[in-house]
Curated annotation (Swiss-Prot):
The keyword Transferase does not apply. InterPro entries: Metalthion_15p. Belongs to the metallothionein superfamily. Type 15 family. Expressed in vascular tissues of all organs. Expressed in root and leaf phloem, pollen and root hairs. Metallothioneins have a high content of cysteine residues that bind various heavy metals. Functions as a metal chelator of copper (Cu) and zinc (Zn). Functions cooperatively with the phytochelatin synthase PCS1 to protect plants from Cu and cadmium toxicity. Plays a role in Cu homeostasis, specifically in the remobilization of Cu from senescing leaves. The mobilization of Cu from internal sources is important for seed development. This is Metallothionein-like protein 2B. Keywords: Metal-binding, Metal-thiolate cluster. One of its GO terms (molecular function) is copper ion binding.
Amino acid sequence: MSCCGGSCGCGSACKCGNGCGGCKRYPDLENTATETLVLGVAPAMNSQYEASGETFVAENDACKCGSDCKCNPCTCK
């Protein structure tokens, strides 16, 4: 998530909002105050899948707040 001086994040319609909110691509998860505890056992991952984690795209998809608290560039989807 990008911030503009720690106080601005790109909000809806590519306009800057309050807080460090990034692009707010997941608004339903934005302000949740719940905890989830997952218990269980999973099989060990083999090396074929371990390297694939490096290919994820950044969450804000190049959406950053500039020095004047405007999104620059903003490609929110």
